[in-house]
């Protein structure tokens, strides 16, 4: 019910009309996939979905459930899966595991965020790592992923990224 209330509140304040954002990020916990995740998709708040996952079994299970939900919604013209961002947790063979996963579900890895202590250091300062120091290698990785998400898929295929 919390996610539904969130969108009702955004509607009450006409947030999307007032701010006209180009990108809106919904951070949905993996265990909310069934009910809550569907709200932004069914109500037209999302055109594309980027799943952030690790190579951990339960994270991939949640990602697979999101993909199944998107497949079910696809017939109705709702949001489609743009790809996967791998947020590394230092699982053995993690990149290979996620590469196999994306191949099985028919998508791609948009980018890989390495496990990096600078991220935790930034969190301790109540900042993102990019806010803390945009020149760090991990910050540059995140910026590159963001740029890739911002470029339409069609332009990427034409060699823009």
Regions found by a protein language model. Name each.
Residues 7-14, 71, 146, 150:
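Generic structural signal for well-ordered alpha-helical scaffold segments
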Residues 12-18, 22-23, 28-112, 121:
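Conserved catalytic-core segment of NTP-binding enzymes
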Residues 106, 153, 157-161:
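Iron-sulfur (Fe-S) cluster-binding modules
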Residues 1-15, 123-124:
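P-loop/Walker-type NTP enzyme "switch/lid" segment
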Residues 125-139:
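C-terminal boundary of histidine-terminating zinc-finger modules
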Residues 112-117, 138, 144:
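NTP-dependent small-molecule kinase module
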Residues 141-156:
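C-terminal alpha-helix
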Residues 3-7, 57-64, 95, 139-143:
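Amphipathic alpha-helical transducer elements in NTP-driven molecular machines
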């Amino acid at each position: 019910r919390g996610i539904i209330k969130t969108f009702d509140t955004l509607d009450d304040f006409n947030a999307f009309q007032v701010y006209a954002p180009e990108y809106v990020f919904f951070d949905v916990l993996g265990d909310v996939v069934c009910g809550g995740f569907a709200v932004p998709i069914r109500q037209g708040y999302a055109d594309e979905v980027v799943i952030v996952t690790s190579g951990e079994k339960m994270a991939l299970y949640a990602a697979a459930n999101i993909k199944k939900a998107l497949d079910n919604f696809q017939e109705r013209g709702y949001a489609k899966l743009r790809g996967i961002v791998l947020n590394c947790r230092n699982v053995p063979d993690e990149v290979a595991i996620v590469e196999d996963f994306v191949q099985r579900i028919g998508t791609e890895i948009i980018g890989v965020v390495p496990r990096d202590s600078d991220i935790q250091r930034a969190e301790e300062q109540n900042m993102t790592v990019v806010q803390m120091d945009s020149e760090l290698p991990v910050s540059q990785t995140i910026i590159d992923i963001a740029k890739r998400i911002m470029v339409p898929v069609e332009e990427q295929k034409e060699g823009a990224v």
